[in-house]
Design a protein with these regions (language model features):
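Hydrophobic positions on the alpha1 helix immediately C-terminal to the Walker A/P-loop
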Residues: 39
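P-loop (Walker A) phosphate-binding loop of NTP-binding proteins
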Residues: 31
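Conserved glycine(s) of the Walker
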Residues: 35
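ATP-dependent NMP and nucleoside kinases share a basic, alpha-helical "lid"
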Residues: 106-155
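Extreme N-terminal, non-catalytic leader segments
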Residues: 1-25
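Small-molecule kinase domains that catalyze NTP-dependent phosphoryl transfer to phosphate-bearing small molecules
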Residues: 106-107, 128, 133, 157-190
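Short beta-strand-centered segment that lines the nucleotide-binding/catalytic pocket of NTP-utilizing
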Residues: 49-62
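Conserved nucleotide-sensing/catalytic segment adjacent to the nucleotide-binding pocket
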Residues: 63-106, 118
Length: 190
């Protein structure tokens, strides 16, 4: 079953109305160029809260080993994301965001994000099993291959499109399939 935006928003609102002071963590995973960032921004605009981007958690240079890059779901720094984002949020603490910057893949301080009850984690690999399911809600956003190609071409250009097609899209698809990501998420109509 695919949910509408309003149905997803209503579910998030219900979690936020709980008297419980625990954080509401929402994950938005799915294909690259499917609309994850757009969905996160819309939820934030309508409901408030924070948005954290998995794209800030690329592997650093020293982590880019053959073994790590062969690992299903291994081309994101899931250890650092859990330590720097998920663990502080579960304790109701602010989060210091250090983005991994191209082309040298070194960490650069970006900002400190104050704690809010609603925290939206968006990006491929946001539902990685390493995180031990900290989310109240997991959403999967999907786009067909042709739509992906057109959006990536427009957003990233022809040269990067080839890298997406040959490298990143196959890695994502392997992660979705082997870790049953889509099956463990609500799916949204975009």
């Amino acid at each position: 079953m695919k949910y509408s935006y309003d149905e997803i928003k209503n579910l998030v609102e219900k979690y936020m109305q709980d008297e419980d002071e625990s954080p509401v963590l929402i994950a938005i995973d799915g294909n690259c160029a499917a609309g994850k960032t757009t969905l996160a921004a819309r939820l934030q605009s309508d409901l408030g809260g924070n948005v954290f981007h998995m794209d800030d958690y690329y592997l650093q240079s020293f982590q880019r080993t053959k073994e790590r890059l062969r690992e299903t779901g291994g081309n994101v720094d899931y250890e650092r994301f859990k330590k720097e984002v998920i663990e502080p949020l579960k304790k109701g603490e602010a989060v210091g965001v250090y983005a991994c910057i191209h082309p040298d893949f070194v960490l650069e301080y970006r900002e400190t994000i104050e704690y809010k009850k609603l925290n939206i984690i968006e990006g491929s690999y946001s539902c990685h099993p390493y995180f031990d399911s900290p989310y109240k809600l997991q959403i999967f956003v999907e786009a067909g291959f042709e739509v992906q190609v057109e959006r990536i071409r427009k957003r990233n250009g022809e040269v990067m499109l080839q890298r997406f097609i040959n490298e990143w899209i196959p890695k994502e698809n392997e992660y979705f399939r082997k870790m049953k990501i889509k099956e463990n998420c609500l799916q949204i109509k975009m």
